[in-house]
Amino acid sequence: MSHQEPEAKIFACSQSVHLAEQIAEKYGIPLGKVTFSKFSDGEFQPSYEESIRGLRVFIVCSTFPTADNLMELLLMIDAAKRASARHITPVIPYFGYARQDRKDKPRVPIGAKLVAKLLETAGATRIMTMDLHADQIQGFFEKPVDHLFASTIFLPYLKSLNLENLTIASPDMGGSKRAYAYSKFLDSDVVICYKQRKAANVIGTMELIGDVQGKNVVLVDDMIDTGGTLAKAADLMIEKGALSVRAICTHAILSGDAYEKIENSNLLELIVTDSIPLKKESKKIRVVSCAPLFAEVMHMVQNNTSISGKFLM
């Protein structure tokens, strides 16, 4: 008797509906119906408005802002489990708490590990995410993790710019692996910024390792938070003789006065995905959607086909 995969349905947490609608459209099915009730004390309760018994359920939820979205996702996973869904895959374009991947000082938690345990305890049978801040977070899970790379969608855009004398730059030492991966596909040089922080999100000094004289520079990073690092790196590149400076960052957190920093910086363009909705528009920010990538990989998961071809890094 042949084995037939269960039907798939896609649902979304309340703050990821727009992205989920695009994913569902690319996938070729309507977005599933779910309602969210909120009690007077602030508690919320999701409810699936259609049967999911025996089905493969994808739940799209970027966990930013972190606390409420994560709790909402956990409740949706639990509800799907109790409604007898056969497979439950949280699709987490931006994985919150990923910066807490180790103990970097005494008496602090490993938040990413805790989140992994919570997702699995709630009932997740597979995890799908994109550009984790630290690759080793995949090892925090016992269930399979499909870790996608935004390079799949960024590289075609970069190639379309036809930039001469292109140089890829990492804004810090930790991102050098990512920078070298991009340079491999673009056949370009690499430079690295060495920074020393005074405190979290506060940069002390920054120095450049490499030459950018007469080059068109593209900074690559997994996220942009306050924007301080990229703004300072762009200023440094121009100071060292770069012709232009762009940046590609998968996750646009853009907290505090980040928009103002970007507008006032030497960055010609900031390219991001829609893993996190932008708070406002900016003439310097270009959004490249990750919806087609997620829809394609979700199809591959549904059909039990290899997704290794989607990994460019």
Q: Where is each model-derived feature located?
A:
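PRPP-associated nucleotide enzymes
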Residues: M1-M313
